[in-house]
């Protein structure tokens, strides 16, 4: 059995802590034979435990404490602490591991409630579960999610060589916004969501780049951001935004412009990797 969970890109500009999309990088968990102890084989970051201390197993045991230990093989091309939902993918995989091994028969909505309680907000875990574009909210123990197709566009991701942890990225945000600022910020977010749902990427792109909630505070933490945005816009992009808490920079591109923008960014002397990504429409799935 193999559990597959997509990467996710959250916020998408003004959709702060509430909007995310599933993308074509993946965490895969191969569930192998029963074992005396939990064993997680991987060639990932050496900081990631290879026993029951692994977050994947911790999550599974929270839901089903009596499941028999297994040998697991973990592979992932979702980079750690880069704003592509690496921790959310593990949380969703852990829930699915318990769901499969303990035969919990959880619905997607039940998975979402559990994942949101663990993660604190649904913007990454929701698209990891459902796939596609998800607009979600969590308030007073109530979680809501609306799943929609993402408009016809490509994603070009610049993933820097350096990490930017969410806690650091949140420290630069203001403690409060004035009433006037909040109204302006929410109106921009409303336009961005409406345009995405309608499929109008030109209007969506302008709104995405006009965010007032977080981007202007975080952009100075990512030294390549302004150059990428300038080059992408000059060559016909819809928008450039910070993926999640960063430092990944995401360019939304018309499909006929993607190759030009991708090649142009490849020629720059940026210290990181550049990928063309597509929307994942399935979310978490199990191959048996």
UniProtKB/Swiss-Prot annotation:
InterPro entries: GHMP_kinase_C_dom (IPR013750), GHMP_kinase_C_sf (IPR036554), GHMP_kinase_N_dom (IPR006204), GHMP_knse_ATP-bd_CS (IPR006203), Homoserine_kinase (IPR000870), Ribosomal_Su5_D2-typ_SF (IPR020568), Ribsml_uS5_D2-typ_fold_subgr (IPR014721). The gene is thrB. It is found in: Cytoplasm. One of its GO terms (biological process) is threonine biosynthetic process. This is Homoserine kinase. It is an enzyme of class 2 (transferase). Catalyzes the ATP-dependent phosphorylation of L-homoserine to L-homoserine phosphate. ATP binds at residues 79-89. One of its GO terms (cellular component) is cytoplasm. It comes from the Bacteria. Pfam families: GHMP_kinases_C (PF08544), GHMP_kinases_N (PF00288). The lineage of its organism: Bacteria, Bacillati, Bacillota, Bacilli, Lactobacillales. Its EC number is 2.7.1.39.
């Amino acid at each position: 059995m193999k559990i597959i969970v997509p990467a996710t890109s959250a916020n998408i500009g003004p959709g702060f802590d509430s909007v995310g999309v599933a993308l074509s990088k993946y965490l895969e968990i191969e569930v192998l034979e029963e074992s005396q102890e939990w064993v997680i084989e991987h060639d990932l970051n050496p900081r990631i435990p290879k026993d029951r201390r692994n977050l994947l197993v911790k999550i599974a045991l929270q839901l089903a404490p009596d499941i028999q230990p297994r040998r697991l093989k973990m592979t992932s091309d979702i980079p750690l602490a880069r704003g592509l939902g690496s921790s959310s993918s593990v949380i969703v995989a852990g829930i699915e591991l318990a769901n499969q091994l303990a035969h919990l028969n959880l619905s997607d909505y039940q998975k979402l409630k559990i994942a949101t309680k663990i993660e604190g907000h649904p913007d990454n875990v929701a698209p990891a579960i459902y796939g596609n574009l998800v607009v979600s909210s969590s308030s007073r123990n109530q979680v809501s999610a609306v799943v929609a197709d993402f408009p016809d566009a490509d994603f070009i991701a610049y993933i820097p060589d350096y990490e930017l942890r969410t806690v650091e990225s949140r420290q630069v945000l203001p403690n409060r916004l004035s009433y006037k600022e909040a109204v302006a910020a929410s109106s921009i977010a409303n336009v961005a969501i409406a345009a995405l749902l309608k499929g109008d990427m030109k209007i969506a792109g302008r709104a995405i780049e006009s965010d007032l909630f977080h981007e202007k505070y975080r952009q100075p933490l990512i030294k390549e951001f302004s150059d990428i945005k300038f080059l992408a816009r000059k060559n016909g992009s819809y928008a450039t935004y910070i993926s999640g808490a960063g430092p990944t920079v995401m360019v939304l591109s018309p499909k006929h412009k993607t190759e030009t923008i991708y090649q142009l960014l490849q020629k720059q002397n940026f210290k990181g990797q550049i990928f063309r990504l597509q929307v994942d429409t399935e979310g978490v799935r199990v191959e048996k």
